[in-house]
Design a protein with these regions (language model features):
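N-terminal secretory signal peptides that target proteins for export/translocation
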Residues: 1-5
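A short, flexible low-complexity segment enriched in Lys/Arg and Gly/Pro that occurs
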Residues: 8, 108-125, 371-388
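A generic structural signal for well-ordered coil/turn residues at beta-strand boundaries
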Residues: 12, 93, 176, 330-332, ...
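Zymogen propeptides
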Residues: 25-276, 281-291
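Extended C-terminal subregions enriched in glycine
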Residues: 299-399
Length: 399
């Protein structure tokens, strides 16, 4: 029996809906208008309502929104819509996915598997990659997530802007704005956001043949010989010099060294930020590391007794504090709804949008708004309109 999964990726593209089962239903009767922060939102027509599996529901609505702001482009970068007129309704194309908090259903932050870095891919490619790497799980739906280095100008190109934790793998422990975590615990506390994201020092995890962690050890320093009883990490890392990408190459000493030359994934983010996982390929050899490769050099007798060729190891900074119970964490933007009310808008321009929120019972709400296509009645939203939308669909908090 296949399990069910709701998946998030970090690419900024349109919502992908998989498995549509029921024809559209048109709404009749009194119009329900949701208002907050000077913005208003209502559904003009329900185009589709699709009941997926495990209580997951997708709806596509033709909607209208307004704001008490004025003067900015009504269609964002599509100037054909003129400027926003305060309190005038503009048409919107909205997709909403509701995911009940329950066992057997997960929200996963997934990036394309790349041993040495980050790779551009479509949502469909990401969904296929997830299923390939996680046999038995089925992707039901996918939605865009965090922003990322879309032009590939960073030292390690195409990284996400914020935190990336995927099924407990802390791929990128660097926060930007908001950080959104998913507990996947089946309770009303399905989402953690608006907290201080924290990680501990780098840690080495040693796995047994069943993929279970049997021991963990602190990493004391980087790219230098360890003192007695200590363990250090060696890795080559990229950096920018006057906009030019360069690498600081490291050479592993032969004594007390255990090197992974074919990592499952090796992400060198800076001189003191690294994630790596893979089986030990070489023991006790001097070697110049290429980007993504890494080595453990240790004078800890307990650790040395566990390390050998083909032993699976992982280097990461474990999540601590408020997000410690979240197995999937993603970077986000601002707070839209807090304690059931619209909250502090800061962006007063219309764009295509992606949102996530939580209902009081733990149900997660994912929403997208199309934009920059005035001729198709897709104007996009500014933040106060987004808040009205998320309140309309029952969220007590949203981001």
């Amino acid at each position: 029996m296949k399990k069910t999964i709701k998946k998030i990726c970090f690419f900024i593209i349109s919502l992908v809906i998989l498995t549509l089962l029921f024809p559209g239903l048109k709404v009749f009767g009194e119009t329900e208008i949701t208002e907050t922060l000077g913005a208003r939102y209502y559904v003009e027509e329900n185009v589709e309502t699709n009941f997926l599996r495990s209580g997951i529901v997708h709806v596509k609505d033709k909607a209208m929104s307004s704001t008490d702001e004025s003067g900015m482009s009504a269609g964002g970068s599509d100037s054909s819509g003129g400027t926003v007129i305060a309190n005038q309704f503009y048409p919107q194309s909205v997709n909403v996915l509701t995911v009940p908090s329950q066992s057997g259903v997960k929200v996963v932050n997934w990036t394309l598997t790349n041993p040495l870095g980050w790779t551009l891919a479509t949502v469909r490619e990401l969904a296929k990659d997830f299923e390939k790497n996680n046999p038995g799980w089925k992707v039901v739906a996918a939605i865009n997530g965090d922003f990322f280095d879309i032009k590939g100008t960073g030292a390690l190109p195409y990284q996400t802007n914020g935190v990336t934790v995927s099924n407990g793998e802390v791929l990128r422990p660097i926060t930007n704005n908001a950080t959104i975590g998913f507990t996947n615990n089946g309770t009303e506390n399905s989402l953690v956001a608006g907290k201080n994201f924290q990680v501990g020092q780098h840690q080495l995890d040693v796995f047994d043949n069943n993929g279970e962690i049997i021991a963990s050890f602190a990493i004391n320093s980087f790219n230098t010989e360890p003192d007695e009883g200590e363990t250090n990490l060696y890795f080559t890392f990229p950096y920018l010099e006057n906009g030019e990408r360069k690498e600081q190459t490291q050479v592993v000493p032969p004594e007390n060294s255990y090197t992974v030359i074919s990592p499952i994934r090796g992400l060198a983010m800076s001189a003191n930020k690294f994630y790596g996982k893979g089986k030990i390929n070489v023991v006790g050899e001097e070697r110049t590391l290429t980007l993504g490769q890494f080595a453990i050099v240790t004078k800890n007798a307990e650790l040395k007794a566990l390390l050998a060729k083909n032993v699976l190891i992982r280097i990461q900074q474990p999540v601590i504090g408020d997000y410690a119970e979240c197995d999937n964490i993603i970077g986000g933007g601002v707070t839209l709804v807090l304690n059931g009310e619209g909250y502090n808008p800061t962006d007063f321009n219309r764009h295509p949008r992606t949102m996530v929120g939580r209902k009081a019972d733990g149900t997660l709400v994912f929403a997208t708004v199309d934009g920059r296509q005035v001729a198709k009645n897709m104007y996009g939203m500014l933040q106060e309109e987004m808040a009205a939308l998320m309140l309309h669909y029952g969220c007590v908090e949203a981001y």
